């Protein structure tokens, strides 16, 4: 990684829209990464799990994160830690701005995980 690649300005980089209602910009290191996530109200993440942990910090909005029957409603200045191999899903109950920290994830760095956020039944975000 070059020194010039180490600074990220979220005001200059709005991120990439993966599907309608979900955009993400990423700051990528060699072993860790951080995502600046914007979700429109009603945006979903389908149930899934992965072999790394993830920490979500909500800057603004209201994000419902579900672990089976256990539910966390995250609002501004609240976080949740998602352990490895724990199935989870989510719904934005209001427009959300959040920061997600995780291990390096090639599918995020290359914007190849859009299918997690796509509702094939409607071809739009579930509401």
Predicted regions and their residues:
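A short, N-terminal "cap"/entry segment at the start of jelly-roll beta-barrel domains
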Residues: 1-31, 115-127
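Conserved short histidine dyad/triad with adjacent acidic residue
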Residues: 19-20, 35-49
């Amino acid at each position: 990684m070059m020194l010039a690649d180490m600074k990220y300005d979220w005001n200059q980089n709005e991120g990439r829209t993966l599907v309608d209602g979900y955009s993400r910009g990423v700051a990528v290191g060699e072993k860790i990464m951080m995502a600046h996530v914007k979700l429109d109200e009603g945006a979903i993440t389908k149930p899934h799990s992965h072999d790394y942990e993830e920490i979500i910090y909500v800057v603004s909005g209201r994000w419902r994160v579900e672990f089976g029957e256990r539910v966390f409603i995250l609002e501004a200045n609240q976080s949740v830690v998602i352990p490895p191999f724990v199935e989870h899903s989510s719904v934005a109950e209001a427009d959300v701005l959040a920061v997600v920290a995780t291990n390096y994830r090639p599918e995020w760095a290359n914007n190849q995980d859009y299918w997690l956020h796509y509702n094939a039944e409607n071809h739009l975000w579930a509401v």
